Amino acid sequence: MSWFTPEVIDILISIVKAVVILLVVVTCGAFMSFGERRLLGLFQNRYGPNRVGWGGSLQLVADMIKMFFKEDWVPKFSDRVIFTLAPMIAFTSLLLAFAIVPVSPTWAVSDLNIGILFFLMMAGLAVYAVLFAGWSSNNKYSLLGAMRASAQTLSYEVFIGLSLMGVVAQADSFNMQAIVESQAHMWNVIPQFFGFITFAIAGVAVCHRHPFDQPEAEQELADGYHIEYSGMKFGLFFVGEYIGIVTVSALIVTLFFGGWQGPFLPPFVWFALKTAFFMMMFILIRAALPRPRYDQVMSFGWKVCLPLTLLNLLATAAVILYNAQ
C-alpha cells in the first residue's frame, strides 16, 4: 500500500466531495420539477399532482419511468451527431457551472481563482447547445426558436457579467471563497443592490424561465428549439433547466447573501436554506408574472438592465477610489 500516500487520500476525498455535491445538485433539480407543480397548484388554488404515491410523492419516479421508456426518435433529415450532442452539452454545462460554488468553507467541487470567469464560460457554452438543437433538427420552427433563445441568452449574459464586476471589484478577487469571506461584516446585497437586481433578472432570462421563456413557450413557435426531441434527450433539456435554476440560486446566495455564512447553524445548512428560498422565488415569479412579448424582453435588457449595470459599476468604482484616499 505504498501508493496510499496523504496526497492520494486528499485526491480521493476531493473526488468524493465533487461527486456528492454534483449528485445533490442533480437530485435537487429533478425534485424541483415536482415541487414546482405542487406549489403552482397551491398558488392557483388547485391540487397539483397528487395521485402517484402518498400526496403525489412518487410523481417524479413515474415521470422518469415514462420518459425513459418513450421512443428515442430522431428526425430523418437531421444531423444525428449534433442532434445527440446538444442535450448532453446543455445538461453538462449547467451542471459544471455549479462546480465553483462553495457549499461550506471546506466543501466545493473546485476552488478556482477564476471562479466567476469559469461560470461565465459554462453559461456561454450552454448557448451552443441551443443552437445545435435548433439547427440539427432540420425544422424551421426549431431553428427560429433557437435563434431567439440564443439572442436572448447572449444579451442577458452581458448583463450578468457586468453585474458581477461590482462584486469582483469590492472583493478584489474572482475566487468564490474570497467573495464569501469578504461578506463577513456586510452582505454584498446592500452595497451592490442594483447589481443583485440585474443579476437576478438576467439569471431568470438565461435559464429561459418565465417570464423570459418566449423561445420555448408552448404558445410561441410550436414549443421552441427542442420541438423534435423526445425520450431521455428531452429529459436532459428538461432537468438541465432546473439545474440552471439551482445554480443561479446558489450563485445569488454566494455572491450577494453571504454564501454559507450565518449564526448557530452549520454552514452547509445556511447555504441550503438560502438557496431553497431563491429556488422558491423562481416558482413564485412563474406563478405571478405575465409573459411579455419577445421585443419587450430584448428592449428591457438593453434599455434598462445595461444602463443599470453600468451605473452600478461606476458607483462602485467611485466608492473604491474614495476609500483608497
Swiss-Prot record:
Membrane topology: Multi-pass membrane protein
Bilayer-crossing regions: 11-31, 81-101, 114-134, 149-169, 186-206, 237-257, 265-285, 304-324
Pfam family, any one: NADHdh
GO cellular component: plasma membrane
Biological process according to GO: aerobic respiration
Main location, first listed in the record: membrane
Highest taxon above the source species: Bacteria
Enzyme class: translocase
EC number(s) given by UniProt: 7.1.1.-
Localization (cell): Cell inner membrane
Coiled coil (UniProt feature): none
A GO MF term: NADH dehydrogenase activity
InterPro entries tied to this protein: NADH_UbQ_OxRdtase_su1/FPO (IPR001694), NADH_UbQ_OxRdtase_su1_CS (IPR018086)
Keywords assigned: Cell inner membrane, Cell membrane, Membrane, NAD, Quinone, Translocase, Transmembrane, Transmembrane helix, Ubiquinone
Catalyses which reaction(s): a quinone + NADH + 5 H(+)(in) = a quinol + NAD(+) + 4 H(+)(out)
Complex and partners: NDH-1 is composed of 13 different subunits. Subunits NuoA, H, J, K, L, M, N constitute the membrane sector of the complex.
Function description: NDH-1 shuttles electrons from NADH, via FMN and iron-sulfur (Fe-S) centers, to quinones in the respiratory chain. The immediate electron acceptor for the enzyme in this species is believed to be ubiquinone. Couples the redox reaction to proton translocation (for every two electrons transferred, four hydrogen ions are translocated across the cytoplasmic membrane), and thus conserves the redox energy in a proton gradient. This subunit may bind ubiquinone.
Protein family membership: Belongs to the complex I subunit 1 family.
Name assigned to this protein: NADH-quinone oxidoreductase subunit H
Source organism: Serratia proteamaculans (strain 568)
Taxonomic classification: Bacteria, Pseudomonadati, Pseudomonadota, Gammaproteobacteria, Enterobacterales
